[in-house]
Amino acid sequence: MNPIAQSQGAAYSKGHTRNLYADLTLSQDLSGFVKGLGVNFRLSYDNYSSVWEKHSKTFAFKGYSTRWADGPFYTTVSGGESGEMETDASTNDWARQFNFAGGFDYNRSLGKFDIYSQLKWDYEYRDAYGLNTTVYRQNVSWYTHLGFNKRYYLDLALLASQSSLLAPGHKWAFSPTVSAAWVLSEENFMKNVSWIDFLKLRASFGVINADYLPRNGDDTVYNYWDQIYTTTGTMYRFDSGYNSAFGSTYISRLATTNSTHEKAYKYNVGIDATLFKGLNLTVEGYYQRRKDIWVSSEGQYSSVLGMDAPFENAGIVDSWGTEIGLDYTKQISDVVFNIGGNFAWNRNEIKEQMEEPRLYDNLVQTGNRLNQVYGLIAEGFFKDEADIASSPTQNFSTVVPGDIKYKDVNGDGTIDSNDQIAIGYSTVAPEIYYSFHLGAEWRGIGFSAMFQGTANYSAVLNTKSMFWPLINNTTLSSHYYENRWTPENLNAKYPRLSSQSNANNYQTNTIWLEDRSFLKLRNVELYYKFPKNLMQKTKILGSAKLYVRGVDLLCFDKIDVADPESYGATNPLNKSVVVGLKIGF
């Protein structure tokens, strides 16, 4: 062979990623025909592809074989053929998207009336590498805003939408929304209220339709209104071909009948106000009912069905909450200061999800939050063998002193998965978000800071090494070691240390449940703005600002050894301090 040629010139590969983004927007004022009328169009096309090239060639070779038995003797060996470089190319990934939007708009003031109206058609087409990836949607919408005398406002939107993801006969949906507002501060009876600068009441109602569909792990979209068939190999053990695999096709999931859009009924009321010539206030509350949510109907069928149960539009979830925002700016002599904050509280409840019948009430999930944590209630650790003997039997694994002792929730004298109950809050999103900011400036010298926090937020501390040590050859953290149970430390935070997996201790339970709430100093900045007269002397610079900025410098939380936003086996969030100069021309 020719090793040098083979290693250096026999083959190479090249990968190409190609992207095309094209946008076209056209608008035309038609006031010459109808005052206030206009027309607009927009086209966009995105294309992405990944191409892989493979180049290869062959070489002729010559070699020598030497034999020394009766003196040196050489034998020539040759073979192969020299060929031209061959090329093979393939596309291993691609995606494309086309969007079109066009319509008419009308904007005009008629006496005390302000009118804006829009009639629009949208079309979207998406396609990508793989099976069942083509999706198209279209919307026909009409939106109208009407204002009267700068006091009363009415908005109406009507939307008809179509989606290819849903079954024939159910592709179209109608979504109406309406909102109204009343600016009380413009009324004559409010003119003498000096401390109210602006006051508006508003309310809205709408129905939103969505074409969400359940998907499998590779994001494939199935046609759930059809039966799904699966092909597999089955072993027939007879005759000479006993070890051969023969394909078989069977129904793996039943079809969904009358599939439709998921619907959200949204209600909102709010107040916007400006008080005392500087205090801006926003208060609003909302209620939402989502229905026809896609859920599995598996809980409604016996396990002898023999195939996967269909998905159904049967889920119902209620959500409600409130948001409050405050901002106040005031100037006293040469000092300008600003302070404000936001608070949001949100809660939800599962009303229906076709849940299977449960043996005990504590196992029922309907009526609880989305993404609620379920686990066992820990009552401490077993002190000794007598404590174990006098306690309900725990069936997860053999227990010894130092293992977690659980509460018998259902009272059957045995601890197992039937003793799980709702514990803590959601691990996905907190119920409460809040933030507040403050800042001040004096003759160009100033500072600003923004804090952000969460509450009613849970974490399950199941990270191996740190909280579950020595499992599958993982390491042991000093945090666990210092807080483990020992006969001398009966009030420990964590169970005894074990070199083997311990099914009893590593169930989801209140030992591993932690409050994930936190308060962080998100941003803080000290700065100096150079005087304008100095900038004018440069005849080049319009402004200049020297600053020192810090990000995520402080965190107050109850998870001491990890960041509450990234407490798993991942890179921690970074703290940073930046010194910079911002220049404007």
Residue ranges and their predicted role:
Residues 1-56, 65-373, 504, 508-585:
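Extracellular/periplasmic, surface-exposed regions of secreted and cell-surface proteins
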Residues 427-460:
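Glycine-rich, aromatic-lined ligand/substrate-binding cores of catalytic
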Residues 85-88, 392-403, 479-484:
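Residues embedded in well-ordered regular secondary structure
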Residues 309-318, 357-375, 423-435, 439, ...:
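C-terminal extracellular loops and terminal segments
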Residues 61-62:
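Active-site-proximal polar cores
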